[in-house]
Amino acid sequence: MTPLRVFRKTTPLVNTIRLSLLPLAGLSFSAFAAQVNIAPGSLDKALNQYAAHSGFTLSVDASLTRGKQSNGLHGDYDVESGLQQLLDGSGLQVKPLGNNSWTLEPAPAPKEDALTVVGDWLGDARENDVFEHAGARDVIRREDFAKTGATTMREVLNRIPGVSAPENNGTGSHDLAMNFGIRGLNPRLASRSTVLMDGIPVPFAPYGQPQLSLAPVSLGNMDAIDVVRGGGAVRYGPQSVGGVVNFVTRAIPQDFGIEAGVEGQLSPTSSQNNPKETHNLMVGGTADNGFGTALLYSGTRGSDWREHSATRIDDLMLKSKYAPDEVHTFNSLLQYYDGEADMPGGLSRADYDADRWQSTRPYDRFWGRRKLASLGYQFQPDSQHKFNIQGFYTQTLRSGYLEQGKRITLSPRNYWVRGIEPRYSQIFMIGPSAHEVGVGYRYLNESTHEMRYYTATSSGQLPSGSSPYDRDTRSGTEAHAWYLDDKIDIGNWTITPGMRFEHIESYQNNAITGTHEEVSYNAPLPALNVLYHLTDSWNLYANTEGSFGTVQYSQIGKAVQSGNVEPEKARTWELGTRYDDGALTAEMGLFLINFNNQYDSNQTNDTVTARGKTRHTGLETQARYDLGTLTPTLDNVSIYASYAYVNAEIREKGDTYGNLVPFSPKHKGTLGVDYKPGNWTFNLNSDFQSSQFADNANTVKESADGSTGRIPGFMLWGARVAYDFGPQMADLNLAFGVKNIFDQDYFIRSYDDNNKGIYAGQPRTLYMQGSLKF
């Protein structure tokens, strides 16, 4: 069998995959079934493997397949049925050319009587789901995680336009936590966004304490990260001012298989004690009766570039799905997450200059554990009706030691959350317009018990459950959310009006003071999304939506400068355009957020700070282009860039009026080049951001403790090279890379945490990746 040859036409540009056959080349093999085993992944790669395996000629327009994914192929197939299976969900269909040759073409648009109900707006985060979304939305998939050597959610999120995910800092200065902010919102513990995993709330108390000091999600168990910055608040909440982030877990394989991966990284110029390693494993498949299951594991061991940063994370999941027929589908998810980490803490300017890798806080340590159980059912009797119901239960412990001035504290906190969400969607026609009406309801009940024990720092003794305590509170919330929307397709227009209504009742009992406090409030959230198709590959979108932030347990009953604490409220506006012809993918959007009644908690003195009104305006844009469409010389070379301008201002009258919201760089973006010749992959990437401030006063001069002062901007570069050994070697893939090539010195600050100060950024770091499939 001779090597695969690639040809191109100039108009339109075409990739032609040809394979010379053995002596039987003159015969047609399309009528004979053969055993095939092709793993899910890139559609281009899957088609290439299938052509090589089955011995046929396939002419492919590169713009049709670029960027698309395939579910793989396992079993006995003739050529045509195998191609159809590989193309499932791609929007393409196979066309015979005769003489054992085939080509691909776009599948015809569905007729009105063939419209299919969507139901879940997030869905599987497919390319078409993103393209048809009437708002800013980006999905980063598993194959993209490795390009920059990412091992944490922070590293992936930080490359999305409008998202700022700083280095671990403050009480979230460990990999069990998550810090990110969208469009200038404070990134501390990611409390301004709705964060989900397969549609299930990630926070241990979604309404009463949404801060992700414990974020029980691991990158190794994910297929994709879906970030909906606008146009999703009518379906998802609360805390939706900063959009919706959904972590999509790995799909259950169609056929039984084992996949494993590992990455190790080392920062030679730092004081790293042990190389940091991350591991992931998936074992599972689907039987002929429609029952499938998969065991997922992701683990982390080692330390970061600073002293006192040792980390251990174990994240185990069991996913199951049973589809006895095309009408009924059952699914379940079980998770056990357990981790612990030392926290290096912030440094003063003097300590940073002496040794930026050191830690001056030997007692700070965090640990947490979460158990999750979810069960879902889908009933879809035909393509026009769909009913879903999902129930879930989580039990979470988060605890740790923290030095707070003259005391060392131990703060065990337990949380229990129960929820259920039925949803129904139906399509019907009214004249020339197609309507998909969705209606849903979510009930969520959460309860908490928080303690804080202490000992004197001077004693050098860590507190325990028998030590004195100064906090003993029990809190709870009952939340009801109803939503109704109508997706109207008429001509080239898609118009979706909707309404979400939330009713929340929360309480807190303080056993020390003997007080009982309650709050009850409603939040009506109207929304309107509009999408217009200029062509099949180019659309315009606009939307406006209401969103809100809940009254948190720490805010109940506390008087603040502006009066009694009220729910945070915001109104978001978006206008943008999206283009995707296969070779060029581009998006540009403008946004405006008017955010009222905004509050932040100060951990150093247990107070609530009223920032009041803030206004967030800006531009987000990104593009990816395949240079092979210009000339065959640049085949397999693609470039990409993203940029976000964010102007987040305090608009509350007072001394800080007009100042920038803390931790909101005005300019931020990425650049990169990918080159894939044959089995090799070469990646060059960079990210940059401008300066920012740490406090509402926008203090420029640095304080001695390092907590305030301008935070300088920076630009970092990374590179990676990988080789895919192919299916003959269990799809072994090995890669070597480096982060922060030029060893740029940069840092972030923590302002209102007990372990505030300067946190050094990641120095030059070498890493190695390996993965295989059986």
Swiss-Prot record:
<keyword id="KW-0406">Ion transport</keyword>
<dbReference type="GO" id="GO:1990641">
    <property type="term" value="P:response to iron ion starvation"/>
</dbReference>
<feature type="short sequence motif" description="TonB box">
    <location>
        <begin position="56"/>
        <end position="63"/>
    </location>
</feature>
<dbReference type="GO" id="GO:0006879">
    <property type="term" value="P:intracellular iron ion homeostasis"/>
</dbReference>
<dbReference type="Pfam" id="PF07660">
    <property type="entry name" value="STN"/>
</dbReference>
<dbReference type="GO" id="GO:0033214">
    <property type="term" value="P:siderophore-dependent iron import into cell"/>
</dbReference>
<dbReference type="GO" id="GO:0009279">
    <property type="term" value="C:cell outer membrane"/>
</dbReference>
<keyword id="KW-0798">TonB box</keyword>
<dbReference type="InterPro" id="IPR010916">
    <property type="entry name" value="TonB_box_CS"/>
</dbReference>
<comment type="subunit">
    <text>Interacts (via periplasmic N-terminus) with FecR (via periplasmic C-terminus).</text>
</comment>
<dbReference type="InterPro" id="IPR049654">
    <property type="entry name" value="FecA-like"/>
</dbReference>
<keyword id="KW-0998">Cell outer membrane</keyword>
<keyword id="KW-0812">Transmembrane</keyword>
<dbReference type="InterPro" id="IPR037066">
    <property type="entry name" value="Plug_dom_sf"/>
</dbReference>
<dbReference type="Pfam" id="PF00593">
    <property type="entry name" value="TonB_dep_Rec_b-barrel"/>
</dbReference>
<dbReference type="InterPro" id="IPR010917">
    <property type="entry name" value="TonB_rcpt_CS"/>
</dbReference>
<dbReference type="InterPro" id="IPR011662">
    <property type="entry name" value="Secretin/TonB_short_N"/>
</dbReference>
<comment type="function">
    <text>FecA is the outer membrane receptor protein in the Fe(3+) dicitrate transport system.</text>
</comment>
<dbReference type="GO" id="GO:0015343">
    <property type="term" value="F:siderophore-iron transmembrane transporter activity"/>
</dbReference>
<dbReference type="InterPro" id="IPR036942">
    <property type="entry name" value="TonB_rcpt_b-brl_sf"/>
</dbReference>
<keyword id="KW-0410">Iron transport</keyword>
<dbReference type="GO" id="GO:0023019">
    <property type="term" value="P:signal transduction involved in regulation of gene expression"/>
</dbReference>
<protein>
    <recommendedName>
        <fullName>Fe(3+) dicitrate transport protein FecA</fullName>
    </recommendedName>
</protein>
<feature type="domain" description="TBDR plug">
    <location>
        <begin position="129"/>
        <end position="250"/>
    </location>
</feature>
<comment type="similarity">
    <text>Belongs to the TonB-dependent receptor family.</text>
</comment>
<dbReference type="InterPro" id="IPR012910">
    <property type="entry name" value="Plug_dom"/>
</dbReference>
<feature type="domain" description="TBDR beta-barrel">
    <location>
        <begin position="255"/>
        <end position="774"/>
    </location>
</feature>
<dbReference type="InterPro" id="IPR010105">
    <property type="entry name" value="TonB_sidphr_rcpt"/>
</dbReference>
<dbReference type="GO" id="GO:1902495">
    <property type="term" value="C:transmembrane transporter complex"/>
</dbReference>
<dbReference type="GO" id="GO:0038023">
    <property type="term" value="F:signaling receptor activity"/>
</dbReference>
<keyword id="KW-0813">Transport</keyword>
<keyword id="KW-0472">Membrane</keyword>
<feature type="signal peptide">
    <location>
        <begin position="1"/>
        <end position="33"/>
    </location>
</feature>
<keyword id="KW-0675">Receptor</keyword>
<dbReference type="InterPro" id="IPR000531">
    <property type="entry name" value="TonB-dep_rcpt_b-brl"/>
</dbReference>
<keyword id="KW-0408">Iron</keyword>
<dbReference type="InterPro" id="IPR039426">
    <property type="entry name" value="TonB-dep_rcpt-like"/>
</dbReference>
<dbReference type="Pfam" id="PF07715">
    <property type="entry name" value="Plug"/>
</dbReference>
<keyword id="KW-1134">Transmembrane beta strand</keyword>
<dbReference type="GO" id="GO:0006355">
    <property type="term" value="P:regulation of DNA-templated transcription"/>
</dbReference>
<dbReference type="GO" id="GO:0016020">
    <property type="term" value="C:membrane"/>
</dbReference>
<feature type="short sequence motif" description="TonB C-terminal box">
    <location>
        <begin position="757"/>
        <end position="774"/>
    </location>
</feature>
